Amino acid sequence: GNILLEQENIEITESNCSGHAETSLMIKASKKYSKDFLWNCTLYSTAEPCAMCAGAIYWGNVGKVVYGISEKRLLELTGDDEQNPTFDLPCREVFARGQKDIKVEGPFPEVENEVVEVHKDYWNK
């Protein structure tokens, strides 16, 4: 497959409380592609999408999500950082409450160390 769009977290750089990478990506994607097209796409993320991002993915109509580390593991990295007040609500549970069969793959233990290093650099600035 092809990489159609890429997005980083813009919460700090744009002072946007909903500027998580996945939500921001879905805003871009929904402006550029049809819902039918997006249903056949896969969103890849280093970490499991939070509840807000899972909602954006759901309403944006992406059919598959793949992530490296769980939201619980991300919480272990961020601790009580006010930038990441997270829910204990896996994206699978968010999607299960909806009407779409969004496929989810992750976490992947074989990439955990690499993903953790990326996030450590971000959260420990």
Model-predicted segments: where are they?
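A structural microfeature
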Residues: 4-7
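A short acidic/small-residue loop/turn micro-motif
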Residues: 10-13
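A generic helix-loop boundary/linker signal
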Residues: 15-16, 105
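Short HxH-centered metal-ligating active-site micro-motif
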Residues: 17-52
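Zinc-dependent deaminase
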Residues: 56-125
